[in-house]
Amino acid sequence: RAILRLQQQKYKDAEADFDHAIHLSTRNAGVYINRALARYHQKNLRGAMSDYDIALEIDPNNFIGHYNRGLLRAQVGDDNRAIEDFDFVINMEPDNMMAIFNRGLLRDQTGDYKGAIKDYSTVINEYPNFVIGYQYRAQARKKVGDIKGADADEFKVLKAQLDKQNGVSQNNQTADNSESGNRTRKK
């Protein structure tokens, strides 16, 4: 019932149900994680953080708890500890592109531009049409003095925007024919 109330956005009722579940079983990390979500949606960030901490004391390998706590830590400005949570998630799930992208944003914010570029590049390699990844990578590349790389990323963004305006689907684009670019005209 608590999960249903959470899905119905009845957060106060969901929290009460999770309180009852915790009273019955204090060692269930999932209940604390779900109550943290209910508390978060009621703007009780301290309560949500406390629940994530308790959940991770119970189950230190719970990557959902680490991911959600990382998001919350980022929201409250605890960037370095948020990065630690995302590092944990990425170690558990190396293909978790959302965790990698979020870590990239945080690395960018904390001045680790090379780390941010690496994370953005990982996501872009997996999702080549992820335009916002190119935007953020271009900004980070400018910060490390890679103007050529930044220009290439900005060109990708501009091309994607023009293609969207002209109704060109990114999935139907054909690769540039590099052979035709090397041809010379006969005079």
Regions found by a protein language model. Name each.
Residues A2-K187:
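Alpha-helical tetratricopeptide repeat
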